[in-house]
């Protein structure tokens, strides 16, 4: 489909060629409605969000969706509207409170991953990254990865899963629907293989875990 046809569809749907999304703002509900209409008409993931648009005060659409692997392999990692809504919920309910508490930038190393990208890096189709429900991140310097992991668990935050991975980064997830499990784990390499050790919140509170 050439660009003129695409513009005709957009004008018919929205009545204007101007974007409803303001840079640095959380996409308004009208923009989300527009995105849903665009998806329904074209069958493609929406591109209504752009670089610089905020999903929460300290986290942007760009950093939650970008991937060097996707860029190197020409993979379109554009999320669908429900994936973006999941990312917003993840930012608002977990990542933003972590950023505010530690008062240091949190670097997202992996956020949303489409199925093609997820398979490219060797992950399973069941990964919550493919739904926009999960992110891997680090806070540089102090506190340690374990400090952040433990704070999330000890806090009143609602989360589905939090994993301290190899002492290098945190994997955290949040579900908008259903019950968040509060699953707490540590990932380690044992005899060259990745193993996950699971703990209850009570065990972690008592210090009954091994790094």
Give the role of each language-model region.
Residues 106, 135, 170:
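A broad, low-specificity signal marking well-ordered, structured residues that form hydrophobic/aromatic
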Residues 122-126, 187-190:
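Short, surface-exposed, charged loop/turn segments at secondary-structure junctions
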Residues 95-121:
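Extended, low-complexity, intrinsically disordered C-terminal regulatory tails
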Residues 3-101, 188-211:
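Extracytoplasmic cell-surface/polysaccharide-interacting catalytic and binding patches
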Residues 139-211:
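Catalytic cores and adjacent binding grooves of peptidoglycan-active enzymes
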Residues 109-110, 128-129, 161-165:
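Short beta-strand
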Residues 90-94, 117, 133, 144, ...:
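Amphipathic alpha-helical interface surfaces
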Residues 125-146:
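Acidic, His- and aromatic-enriched active-site or binding-groove loops in soluble protein domains
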């Amino acid at each position: 489909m050439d660009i003129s046809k695409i513009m005709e569809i957009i004008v018919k749907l929205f009545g204007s060629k101007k974007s409803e999304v303001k840079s640095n703002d959380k996409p308004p509900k009208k923009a989300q409605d527009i995105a849903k209409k665009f998806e329904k008409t074209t069958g493609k993931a929406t591109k209504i969000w752009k670089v610089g648009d905020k999903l929460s005060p300290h986290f942007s659409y760009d950093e939650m969706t970008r991937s060097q692997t996707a860029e190197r392999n020409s993979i379109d990692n554009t999320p669908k509207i429900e994936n973006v809504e999941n990312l917003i919920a993840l930012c608002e309910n977990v990542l933003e409170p972590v950023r505010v508490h530690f008062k240091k930038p949190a670097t997202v190393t992996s956020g949303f991953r489409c199925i093609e990208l997820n398979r490219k890096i060797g992950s399973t189709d069941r990964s919550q990254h493919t739904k926009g429900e999960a992110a891997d991140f680090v806070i540089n310097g102090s506190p340690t990865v374990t400090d952040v992991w433990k704070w999330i668990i000890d806090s009143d935050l609602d989360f589905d899963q939090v994993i301290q991975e190899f002492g290098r980064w945190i994997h955290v997830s949040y579900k908008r629907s259903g019950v968040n499990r509060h699953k707490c784990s540590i990932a380690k390499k044992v005899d060259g293989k990745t193993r996950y050790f699971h703990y209850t919140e009570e065990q972690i509170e008592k210090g009954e875990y091994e790094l």
